[in-house]
């Protein structure tokens, strides 16, 4: 990002970045954490945030740290098996951003429109969670970020409106947005 913005390069930062370990995986699926080898066998691990999708949805794609085929397989497992009723409002935008970066705009839109209680938006703009938690801003902010990314793209995206299906059914208009890093 610093190179793209023509800012000074800090060699010490690049050195640290190159030494970051690749994401932990097992059986060609990325794990929730290196200490959780049973991520996809322990229901507790796939009943909260599908946070592993943040590695490709929220951060710049880096092939040194992320194997695209492995991430795609992980994403497919998550779509098929996740306990969505226990997830949180920001999980849906995070899934949308990951799907968009992986060239799956139908899944990106599907994540934002998934019919789940915690993927509901109130008139106030807040993301409804449950009766005890009436205000929840991470879902709202995530939704705005996901839609902006789906419209303006990200560094390296080449198609207009890359997060929306290019099947002729979408007429997406926007202005003033910048690509995500």
Label each residue range with its predicted role.
Residues 52-58:
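Active-site cores of enzymes that catalyze phosphoryl transfer or operate on phosphate-rich substrates
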Residues 1-9:
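Single conserved hydrophobic/aromatic residue that forms the stacking wall/gate
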Residues 13-43, 63-181:
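Non-catalytic carbohydrate-binding regions of carbohydrate-active enzymes
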Residues 48-49, 89:
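Start-of-helix signal in alpha-solenoid helical-repeat scaffolds, especially tetratricopeptide repeats
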């Amino acid at each position: 990002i610093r190179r793209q913005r023509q800012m000074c390069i800090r060699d010490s930062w690049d050195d640290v970045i190159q030494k970051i370990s690749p994401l932990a995986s097992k059986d060609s699926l990325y794990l929730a954490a290196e200490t959780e080898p049973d991520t996809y066998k322990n229901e507790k691990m796939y009943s909260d945030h599908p946070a592993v999708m943040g590695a490709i949805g929220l951060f710049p794609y880096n092939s040194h740290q992320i194997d695209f085929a492995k991430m795609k397989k992980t994403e497919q497992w998550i779509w098929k098996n996740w306990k969505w009723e226990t997830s949180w409002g920001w999980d849906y935008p995070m899934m949308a951003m990951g799907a968009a970066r992986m060239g799956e705009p139908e899944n990106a839109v599907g994540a934002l429109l998934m019919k789940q209680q915690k993927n509901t938006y109130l008139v106030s703009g807040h993301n409804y969670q449950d009766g005890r938690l009436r205000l929840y801003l991470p879902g709202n902010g995530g939704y705005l970020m996901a839609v902006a990314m789906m419209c303006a793209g990200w560094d390296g995206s080449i198609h207009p409106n890359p997060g929306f299906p290019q099947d002729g059914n979408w007429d997406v208009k926007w202005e003033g947005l910048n690509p995500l890093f």
